[in-house]
Amino acid sequence: MLEGIRIVEIEGLGPTPFAGMMFADLGAEVTVIHRKDKSIFSNPKNILDRGKRSIELDLKDPKDLEIAKKIIFRSDALIEGFRPGVMENFGLGPDDLNENPLLVYGRMTGWGQNCLLYTSPSPRDATLSRMPSSA
């Protein structure tokens, strides 16, 4: 169904790895950029990585960042789920990647891009537990 579509997934939590898995299940070529520090998410037995290619990069390293950009520029879509500003700090925000004007940039954040809750210094779970609807 999605054969020939290339998607880059930036390793993260929440809906992003699920979306990447679904895209891969539907035939897309999904490449996950894992953290080089061997995070818990880059476990080779992680079911969410089924059908995906992967590469470990340190996006704070200029050489690795250039490799990531080359992969992204050859892709049809990018998906990520970081807090607002994180990808921009890496130089990988939507405005930074306009070298590929056809790139579909998918953001899947818990609070959207403009919600005041994302500025909370506490972890997301603690923020969620303070909300009346989750008590």
Predicted features and spans:
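N-terminal helix-loop segment corresponding to the beta1-alpha1 unit
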Residues: 1-120
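Single conserved hydrophobic/aromatic residue that forms the stacking wall/gate
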Residues: 118-121, 125-135
